[in-house]
Every structure is written in C-alpha cells, then in structure tokens.
Amino acid sequence: MDVNNVELIISAVRPEQYPETDLPEYALAGRSNVGKSSFINTMIRRKSMARISQKPGKTQTLNFYKIEEALFFVDVPGYGFAKVSKTEREKWGVMIETYITSREQLRGVIQIVDLRHKPTEDDRMMYEFLKYYEIPVIVVATKADKIPRSKWQKNAKIVRETLDFDPDDKFVLFSSETKMGKDEAWQFIKEGME
C-alpha cells in the first residue's frame, strides 16, 4: 500500500474512547522493545510517527493510527515488561483483552516477536489467546538484519515451535532496516480488508 496520509487519532484506555468508525483495524501486539514502533514506521514509511523508545513499556494506551482513510493500526502496550508494577500490568492486560475480544472493527492482529530470541511465555500466551478467540494473526519476526542470514531458518523454527505455530497462519521475517517482509505484512492486511 502506498501511504501518504497517517494520523494519530486518539490514545485510548477505555472502549468509550475508541474512535467511532467502520474502518478495519489491525492491532500490533508484542513484548516491550520488540520493535513495534519500528514496524509501524516502516509500514507507513515514516521515521518517527510511532515514537521509538530505548525504554521498554513506553506505550501505555491503545494508540489508533488512521492510515489513508482506509484502515487503522492500533498499537497496544507491550506485554511482559518487568519494571512496571503488577497492578499496572494487570490494567494493561484487561485493556488489551477488552479491545481484542470486543472490537468489531478488528480484522486481525500482527504479533511481533524478536527473531534473535526464543519467544517468552508471554508471547506464547498471546498467540494462544488469539487462537482461542479465532482472531486472524500474522507472526512477524523482527530484527532479522541483526543476525546472520545463515541463522534465519534455525531461529524461525525455534519461534514457530515455541509458539506451537499453526501452519495455516502467516509467518514473516521482517527488517525495518532493509524493509524485508513489508510487502508480505501488507498482503495479510489487504486480504483481511476484502
């Protein structure tokens, strides 16, 4: 998709704050500091629309980005960040679960994992949660450029096995540096919009 117009519409914490719209929405879920902001910026060809932080746990709201008057990317808080209080983590969990299970406009979730590392228990639980609720999901393994190409398949296999990955789902190796995987991710989005 050729993206020229992107706007952060609202940062929401409750359903009554979600934008009133019929446009399809795609949620971006992943651990803190896994590369969600870089993924968004690569997909929409912007350097800093989604703020990239060195500090994990920066996104604390559901951020609704309207793209080309055609769809929304919804950046959800990163899960599994240890330095946030248990109460805060539970609040985020409820916020994310409420959005994913009740939002009619949600067409799919882009679950982002780091190709360099074995997925965590939180990653596994998120994937299981999406499968349980029959939410279409694509797993995007970011930071492929950070490891030698010779390790891509081995690491991808570890990610798939750890998540108990459903072969019917889409799995994409992604790099915000080289833009690898960008077209495949857009393809998943376009298919869900048809």
Swiss-Prot record:
- This protein's record includes keyword Hydrolase: no
The residue ranges of the EngB-type G domain are 22-194
- UniProt record, GO biological process: division septum assembly
Spans traversing the lipid bilayer: none
> What GO cellular component entries does it have?
cytosol
Cofactor(s) the protein requires to work:
Mg(2+)
- What one GO molecular function would you report for this record? GTP binding
Q: Name one Pfam family in it.
A: MMR_HSR1
What does the similarity note say? Answer: Belongs to the TRAFAC class TrmE-Era-EngA-EngB-Septin-like GTPase superfamily. EngB GTPase family.
What job does this protein perform? Answer: Necessary for normal cell division and for the maintenance of normal septation.
Protein name per its UniProtKB record: Probable GTP-binding protein EngB
